[in-house]
Regions:
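Signature of the first transmembrane helix
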Residues: 6-65, 86, 90-102, 124, ...
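Interfacial transmembrane-helix starts/ends
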Residues: 10-11, 45, 76-89, 118, ...
Length: 430
C-alpha cells in the first residue's frame, strides 16, 4: 500500500509539476517576448549586474532549510516556526545591509544608476523571507497542485506589472519591479495557502540540529550561485551592459526550457527519493525512471531549440537581439544534460550527504572558473563554451560521488539516455 501511495504521489506531482511548468513557460514566453520587443539589451544588462548579489543573499536567507526540513522524518510546528522567524529576520537584515551598500556596488560597475535600481531589486529579500517556511511545508507534503496555482498567479500578476511599466518608459526599473513583485506575491500566497501558520512563541533550538545539515548546503549553494553568475560580474565589469544583455537573453531562453523539465522533476525528486532511502534497489529504480523521463523531455526540447534558435530570435525578438543567438545555442547544448546534474544532487541530498554535495560543488565550480579563465583569451563566446565543457565533465564527477553512496552503474545511466540523445542529435541532419 505504501508503494502504491508513493507511486500515486509521484505521478500526481509529475502531472501538476508538468502542467504548472507548461503554463509558466507559455506565460514567460508571452511576457518575455513583449518585454524584449519594448526594451533593449542594455536594460537587461543593468539588472543582470545585480544577479550575483541577489542570488548569494537569497541562498544565505534560505539557508538550506527546505532540504533540511524535507529530510527530517518527524517535524513539529516549532521547526517550521524557527525557520520562518530566522528567514524573516535575515531578509530584513540583508535588505538593510545591501541598501547601504548600493553606492559601493554602483561604484564597482561605474554605473550610478545602479543605486536606485539595486534598492528595488533587493526588496525581494524582504518579501521572500515570509514564504520560505510555508514553501518548505508545501514542498515536503507534496502540495504540488497548490504550488502550481501560486506560481501561475504570481507570474501573471508580476508579468503584467512589468509590461505596463516598460510601456510607460520605466525601462530597466520595469524588469526590477517585475522580479520583486513575483517574489512578493508568491510569498504572500504561500503564506495563505499553507495550512501551517507561524506563532510568536519562538524556539530557536530546532535550528541547531538543522544547521548541522544545512550549513554545508549554504556554502555549497553560495559556490553554485557564484559559478552560475560569474559571467554577469565579468561582462558587467569589463564589457558593456549591452553585451551582458545579449548574454542574459541567451541564458534566459535556455533557462525557460530547463525550467520546464527541472520543474517537473525537482518538484517531486527529493521528497520521493527521501521516502525510498531505506531501500536502495527501489531508489535506484526510481532514479533511473526519472533519468529516462528527463531524457525523453529534455533532449528533444533543448536540441530542437538550439536548431531553431536563429529563427526564434529573429522572428519573435527581432533583429536587435541577433547577437544573443550563439549564446542561446551554446547554452542549449548544456541545457539538454542539466536535469541529470539536478537529479544527482537531489539523490545525494536525500541521503543527507551534504558534505559530499559541498565537495562536488566546490570541485565543479573550480573547474568552471578554470575553463572560463583558460578560454577568456579567445573572447566571450569561447568563455561560455568553456563553461559548458566544464559542466559536462562535472557530470562524471557527480556520478562518481553518487556511486559511492548508492552504487549506480555509469553504463546503466548512459544506456538510459543514449537512445533518446542519439535520436534527437541526428534528427536535424536527416
Amino acid at each position: 500500500m505504501a508503494e502504491q501511495t508513493l507511486k500515486e504521489k509521484t505521478a500526481k506531482g509529475l502531472f501538476w509539476g508538468g502542467l504548472s511548468n507548461g503554463v509558466q513557460q507559455v506565460l514567460n514566453l508571452v511576457f518575455g517576448l513583449m518585454l524584449a520587443r519594448i526594451l533593449d539589451a542594455s536594460d537587461y544588462g543593468m539588472v543582470g549586474m545585480l544577479a550575483i548579489f541577489s542570488a548569494i543573499a537569497s541562498t544565505i536567507q534560505e539557508s538550506g532549510f527546505t532540504a533540511a526540513l524535507t529530510n527530517q522524518k518527524e517535524i513539529r510546528h516549532e521547526d517550521y516556526n524557527a525557520v520562518f522567524w530566522f528567514s524573516t529576520l535575515t531578509g530584513v537584515s540583508f535588505y538593510l545591509i545591501l541598501f547601504f551598500c548600493a553606492p559601493l556596488i554602483a561604484q564597482f560597475y561605474d554605473k550610478p544608476e545602479l543605486i536606485g535600481l539595486s534598492r528595488i531589486v533587493f526588496l525581494s529579500f524582504l518579501f521572500g523571507g515570509f514564504g520560505i517556511a510555508s514553501n518548505a511545508y508545501m514542498f515536503k507534503t507534496l502540495m504540488v497542485k497548490e504550488r502550481a496555482k501560486i506560481d501561475i498567479i504570481s507570474l501573471i500578476c508580476s508579468g503584467t506589472i512589468g509590461v505596463l511599466l516598460a510601456l510607460n518608459g520605466f525601462a530597466y526599473y520595469g524588469l526590477a519591479i517585475q522580479t520583486t513583485a513575483y517574489i512578493g506575491i508568491g510569498s504572500m500566497l504561500k503564506f495563505c495557502y499553507s495550512p501551517w501558520t507561524p506563532t510568536f512563541l519562538i524556539d530557536w533550538r530546532p535550528l541547531k540540529s538543522m544547521f548541522r545539515f544545512s550549513s554545508k548546503l549554504i556554502v555549497t549553494n553560495v559556490f553554485t550561485q557564484i559559478s552560475n553568475n560569474i559571467f554577469s560580474v565579468i561582462l558587467g565589469k569589463f564589457y558593456s551592459p549591452r553585451q551582458l544583455g545579449f548574454y542574459s537573453q541567451g541564458q534566459k531562453w535556455m533557462g525557460m526550457g530547463n525550467s520546464f523539465v527541472g520543474g517537473m522533476i525537482n518538484g517531486v525528486a527529493q521528497p520521493v527519493l527521501v521516502q525510498s532511502v531505506a531501500d536502495k534497489d527501489r531508489q535506484r529504480n526510481m532514479f533511473r525512471k526519472m533519468v529516462r523521463f528527463g531524457a525523453f523531455i529534455s533532449f528533444p526540447l533543448m536540441f530542437g531549440f538550439a536548431f531553431v534558435a536563429k529563427e526564434f530570435v529573429l522572428i519573435f525578438l527581432g533583429e536587435k537581439w541577433s547577437s544573443s543567438v550563439l549564446f542561446l545555442q551554446i547554452f542549449c547544448c548544456w541545457g539538454a544534460f542539466w536535469y541529470l546534474q539536478s537529479l544527482y544532487t537531489n539523490l545525494l541530498i536525500s541521503h543527507g550527504k551534504s558534505d559530499l554535495y559541498l565537495y562536488g560543488v566546490v570541485i565543479n565550480s573550480t573547474l568552471q572558473l578554470l575553463f572560463i579563465v583558460c578560454f577568456s583569451y579567445f573572447g566571450i563566446y569561447f568563455m561560455v563554451v568553456g563553461f559548458v565543457i566544464a559542466n559536462v565533465i562535472g557530470l562524471l564527477l557527480w556520478h562518481i560521488i553518487i556511486n559511492r553512496v548508492v552504487s549506480i552503474n555509469l553504463f546503466s545511466v548512459i544506456k538510459d539516455i543514449i537512445p533518446v540523445s542519439y535520436t534527437h542529435l541526428t534528427l536535424p541532419t536527416t
